[in-house]
Amino acid sequence: MMKFRFRRQGADPQREKLKQELFAFHKTVEHGFPNQPSALAFDPELRIMAIGTRSGAVKIYGAPGVEFTGLHRDAATVTQMHFLPGQGRLLTLLDDSSLHLWEIIHHNGCAHLEEGLSFHPPSRPSFDNASFPASLTRVTVVLLVAGNTAALGTESGSIFFLDVATLALLEGQTLSPDVVLRSVPDDYRCGKALGPVESLQGHLQDPSKILIGYSRGLLVIWSQATQSVDNVFLGNQQLESLCWGRDGSSIISSHSDGSYAIWSTDTGSPPTLQPTVVTTPYGPFPCKAINKILWRSCESGDHFIIFSGGMPRASYGDRHCVSVLRAETLVTLDFTSRVIDFFTVHSTQPEDECDNPQALAVLLEEELVVLDLQTPGWPAVPAPYLAPLHSSAITCSAHVANVPSKLWARIVSAGEQQSPQPASSALSWPITGGRNLAQEPSQRGLLLTGHEDGTVRFWDASGVALRPLYKLSTAGLFQTDCEHADSLAQAVEDDWPPFRKVGCFDPYSDDPRLGIQKVALCKYTAQMVVAGTAGQVLVLELSEVPAEHAVSVANVDLLQDREGFTWKGHERLNPHTGLLPWPAGFQPRMLIQCLPPAAVTAVTLHAEWSLVAFGTSHGFGLFDYQRKSPVLARCTLHPNDSLAMEGPLSRVKSLKKSLRQSFRRIRKSRVSGKKRTPAASSKLQEANAQLAEQTCPHDLEMTPVQRRIEPRSADDSLSGVVRCLYFADTFLRDATHHGPTMWAGTNSGSVFAYALEVPAATAGGEKRPEQAVEAVLGKEVQLMHRAPVVAIAVLDGRGRPLPEPYEASRDLAQAPDMQGGHAVLIASEEQFKVFTLPKVSAKTKFKLTAHEGCRVRKVALATFASVMSEDYAETCLACLTNLGDVHVFSVPGLRPQVHYSCIRKEDISGIASCVFTRHGQGFYLISPSEFERFSLSARNITEPLCSLDISWPQNATQPRLQESPKLSQANGTRDIILAPESCEGSPSSAHSKRADTMEPPEAALSPVSIDSAASGDTMLDTTGDVTVEYVKDFLG
């Protein structure tokens, strides 16, 4: 009879087709600011901008929603980028001196980015050095000449010319240093070489003229038409940057000593010895180099000179600055990260006599800042995307789906009132190229990020562009050193140079205890809970007007006067007392301080009951914020949990203590191994396990592979950490009466279920009566394998998760089935289990042990709608493991549906930061400043759908592009993988930078729909299983 236990069911074609309509894996878009940017380019005709990174990624941005992403085949730093104006083509230079041509290609009405041709220098071993000049070893600068030719300046001083269409060298047009030296006086040569080519600049009116700057300081105007030198300027300072004047009658050069010089080009053929103007803006003391300089003319005659660097070396050599000089006005823009590059948005039409710059865009290492140059004061222009998510380090995140329009409008209004500027920019976002073809999102989604500085930021996550909406700061409630730091900063700004702080990236936190650990938002009442590192739990409410009021404070002792424990960690944050001013937005109403002040590890809010639950490494508490009184405090510490009392900053175990504990474990395991006598049930389990091994041959692959889960010791460190909290209206006392309950899961596999007595609200009233809430311990479940409990959810009689507070009462969701039997889904790090209620007897389980060492990290219930029918959807359990795999299971049957590889298992921070949404999407950090967005749903996908009006004929390169393999997008974006069965027998898709291919499915996939009669829940199978739960019933 045992052979039938392992018989594999045949695949049901109907179910497989349905799964393909429900599930599909997509990495769709990367939100945030590119990590480690290294190059910048702007196309003034198409109004698009490109950013290159050290990892070889290329990202092109236009209007909000217009994004293109690519990744070089060779992981090298992008050092320079140049658009071919109006053509949708981009030429990139990498640090290995290779050139790559990117093209925006339209397919089926939508545009995407493709890497076309590439050019590699002869130093690469795969090329024949004899066919290339020996001096073409390292390319230092690139200039596009007349749109179809590229000039390559090299380290040897030679300049080569390349045909852009084929990326082939043009024979007979190389400009060697010897040719240039013939036009230089003998006394200037002094037997020295000109040095590397430092800068190449094209003449706007006459493209055949090229301004060449050599590192030693020599400037030359070369005529490509006559193949001769028109002008020579004998500079003596080491050159850094060059720029033409608008009319070509003058040029400006910047140098390594912090000076810049203006040269006149109307002097004729004799070499020019002296510039017309030489100045050191921040002299006379030694200054750092001016790395880049721009000269922009205006009709008013007051021209702009914009440059980076040049600061006094001794006093401000560590500042990251861009200076803007116009007439007598000088502003030193002071940034908190290194300046990569900058450009101006100005008129480039040949018939215009002046540049008339509109905006200045500065790319920094950690953010992008755009300034309005037409408005007095040059204010910053709010960015609709590329906002630095990591302006302060992200510590937690959460997603809120289907945000009501009223709440959305109130949050947007609060954000608009938040930072009014005295000189508000009248300029709209200047990078407006392309058209967004995506439909307007049917529902609004909020992404909440908690940060190290005590702020919570609200982001519009409804579409491709992640737009900042509002910032909540909790630091104002507590006594910190913020005020002192602000006064010091103000004192510095009054000195010379005239510094002006620009940008929002601030990597420093005034107090690490302000860090946000957990957030929860009720979208129907606009109430919010924010919990921090020092045990602070804030209850906030959204207000549309500024207010001044005091914040109530309550302490909750989670240790309950337990003896033998002494907190050795950080102190609590001291709140301000009395009336405090609060701006429009979320304003704190209640501060709950956990004692000891350990970091909050779990929090949940039930606005309909006016209850908030919170947990730390010491226990959990329940608080009634309507009556401002605690309801419950439970200590979960094990007697050996001494590590929980040390705090995050003092967890350094001594060598003596470590050795002592190790020997104790060894001794305990030996003693327990000798003295333990196996019980009858364990003998039966061992016999069943041996019989199972004998029944199936070893070479036959058993699927699913489920290893034996070993029970953990009860004295494991930090076993009392509360991992999850959950409110539910369900059956806990008996099968006929349901009521409010609260559930808590810990690191040691314990689950506590409390029956709550919450006074019912009057008919038509929103708030409940002012009566005390009571909590009675109803059940206590101990998972015998003692794996940490990751999530808890109650399922109604139809096997669906219970609606959120107010959803059912306001007819915003289908009312739960309170007639049939409820069940509770408990997800631990090693297995999922469904228990019937109220008896808490095991009903269904799945041990996620397909790989040794696999642990559950994130779990969420999500609704997957069919791509073929709007009326059909299934609720499933989405799970992310420590191996970076995403699994989807049916609910409540826990049958595996699909399995994808999503995140590299080495990316620990990415796995820890993952957040699932209610509709089958997810976010995770691929860098400190970027979220990768992915979708598990075949229907609900958020990806760039855009087009670009380009003048270059694309059809000529289509055959060549189809012959070369398509390159994956950066970090694996926009790759589509369907359900496992649909991929069998088909060519494998391109591998991306982060693995996004799907592993083979498990053999025991459910062959039928979970709604059909044949898909009844599998009975609990304890073959070879040691995970028999111990349940205490305190209400029986």
Swiss-Prot record:
In this UniProt entry, the residues modified to Phosphoserine are 662, 964, 982, 989
Keywords in UniProt for this one? Answer: Cell projection, Cytoplasm, Cytoskeleton, Endosome, Exocytosis, Golgi apparatus, Membrane, Phosphoprotein, Repeat, WD repeat
Q: Which Pfam families match?
A: Lgl_C, LLGL
One GO biological-process annotation of the entry reads:
axonogenesis
Any one GO MF annotation of this record:
GTPase activator activity
- Effect of deleting the gene: Mice exhibit disorganization and disruption of the apical junctional complex, resulting in hyper-proliferation of neuroblasts and brain dysplasia. Loss of Lgl1 in mice results in formation of neuroepithelial rosette-like structures, similar to the neuroblastic rosettes in human primitive neuroectodermal tumors. The newborn Lgl1(-/-) pups develop severe hydrocephalus and die neonatally.
Subcellular location field: Early endosome membrane; Golgi apparatus, trans-Golgi network membrane; Golgi apparatus membrane; Cell projection, Axon
Provide the positions where the record notes the PTM Phosphothreonine: 957
The record's SUPFAM superfamilies line, in alphabetical order, gives:
WD40 repeat-like (SSF50978)
Phosphoprotein found in the keyword field: yes
Q: Where is the composition biased (Basic residues)?
A: 667-677
- Cellular component, GO, one term: Golgi cis cisterna
Post-translational modification as stated in the protein's UniProt record: Phosphorylated by PRKCI on at least one of the following Ser residues: Ser 654, Ser-658, Ser-662, Ser-669 and Ser-672. Phosphorylation is important for appropriated cell polarization.
Please list where the region (Disordered) is annotated.
667-688, 980-1002
Record flagged with keyword Nucleotide-binding: no
Question: Which residue ranges have biased composition labelled Polar residues?
Answer: 679-688
- Which parts of the chain are WD repeats? 38-71, 78-119, 139-175, 199-233, 239-271, 289-331, 339-373, 395-473, 517-592, 601-662, 722-782, 791-843, 848-901, 915-938
Query: Would you identify the family this protein belongs to, as annotated?
Result: Belongs to the WD repeat L(2)GL family.
State its role: Cortical cytoskeleton protein found in a complex involved in maintaining cell polarity and epithelial integrity. Involved in the regulation of mitotic spindle orientation, proliferation, differentiation and tissue organization of neuroepithelial cells. Involved in axonogenesis through RAB10 activation thereby regulating vesicular membrane trafficking toward the axonal plasma membrane.
Q: How does it assemble?
A: Associated with nonmuscle myosin II heavy chain. Interacts with PRKCI/aPKC, PARD6B/Par-6 and PARD6A. Interacts with STX4A. Interacts with RAB10 (GDP-bound form); the interaction is direct and promotes RAB10 association with membranes and activation through competition with the Rab inhibitor GDI1. Interacts with DCAF1.
What's this protein's name? Answer: Lethal(2) giant larvae protein homolog 1
Q: Which organism is it from?
A: Mus musculus (Mouse)
